[in-house]
Amino acid sequence: RVCMGKSQHHSFPCISDRLCSNECVKEEGGWTAGYCHLRYCRCQKAC
């Protein structure tokens, strides 16, 4: 399912851990708990 979350700079839809990871790499961070932090990427599970 599609969940919405926020990176450090903007909001974008997350569909899978892979997509979240790819998007956050562009932000020089990782997707974690709805935010980009360090290099760890996890899609926000709750919508």
UniProtKB/Swiss-Prot annotation:
**What Gene Ontology biological process does one annotation of this record name?**
defense response to fungus
Per UniProt, which keywords does this protein have?
Answer: Antimicrobial, Disulfide bond, Fungicide, Plant defense
Question: What intrachain disulfides are recorded?
Answer: C3-C47, C14-C36, C20-C41, C24-C43
Q: Which InterPro entries match?
A: Defensin_plant (IPR008176), Scorpion_toxin-like (IPR003614), Scorpion_toxin-like_sf (IPR036574)
Does this entry carry the keyword Disulfide bond? yes
A Pfam short name: Gamma-thionin
Query: Which SUPFAM superfamilies does UniProt cross-reference here?
Result: Scorpion toxin-like
What the record says about family reads: Belongs to the DEFL family. Protease inhibitor I18 (RTI/MTI-2) subfamily.
Q: Return the protein name.
A: Defensin-like protein 1
